[in-house]
């Protein structure tokens, strides 16, 4: 018995009670027909009824790069002329720039792969004592020279691996090691200068002034020279007391002399009233 006959018989007899129906997994149509609502419904649509006749206004609807779906309409290229292949011999030759900056990343013979003889002729690295005597600009220039040279070595190493040359690895690594020692020395010198600058700032905040310290050092040096001269049996003739005093402290010394004299004149007598 088909579905229509079962439904017709159910209408005539007033439908089957649920107890007489087979299980839903055996006859799902019988259960669906009895539980179905009579409310009218329509498919979901977000488009207004008045816009149904205008068609789709989205020109790129359905175009997906993931699913590799092309455009909805065929596109022509007749508007733009297609390029025609040109033989390399017919192309104009370009003159190379002899002083281009990128030549600095290649050896002097301007080849991509440097020879072991060229790599081993690198000399020694800069010592820390030599770098301490250099200025900031010199250290800055030397650092970037090292960076450019290491870039050139890396280019030669990549070309050597690509060609599978089988030689020059030790010479290249040795030259790179010498350059890295120089760079570490530059970092060490700059670190020393940074610590010295921090120490100078700390002393200045505590009230230390290097000018006063230098004047005291000059005074001690003069005192040592006087004691050494007297110890050697030499007579040191000093015409004035000002000769033993630092010029920067001359005013202070004169003020002290006036206070000690108690208002006496140059001849040592008291002033007349």
UniProtKB/Swiss-Prot annotation:
Keywords: Mitochondrion, Ribonucleoprotein, Ribosomal protein, Transit peptide. One of its GO terms (molecular function) is structural constituent of ribosome. One of its GO terms (biological process) is mitochondrial translation. The keyword Mitochondrion applies. InterPro entries: MRP-L47_sf (IPR038340), Ribosomal_uL29_mit (IPR010729). Residues 247-273 are annotated as: Disordered. GO terms for cellular component: mitochondrial large ribosomal subunit. Gene3D superfamilies: 6.10.330.20. Pfam families: MRP-L47. It comes from the Eukaryota. Residues 247-258 have a biased composition (Basic and acidic residues). It is found in: Mitochondrion. Component of the mitochondrial large ribosomal subunit. Mature mitochondrial ribosomes consist of a small (37S) and a large (54S) subunit. The 37S subunit contains at least 33 different proteins and 1 molecule of RNA (15S). The 54S subunit contains at least 45 different proteins and 1 molecule of RNA (21S). PANTHER family: LARGE RIBOSOMAL SUBUNIT PROTEIN UL29M, RIBOSOMAL PROTEIN L47, MITOCHONDRIAL-RELATED. Belongs to the universal ribosomal protein uL29 family. This is Large ribosomal subunit protein uL29m. The lineage of its organism: Eukaryota, Fungi, Dikarya, Ascomycota, Pezizomycotina. The gene is mrpl4.
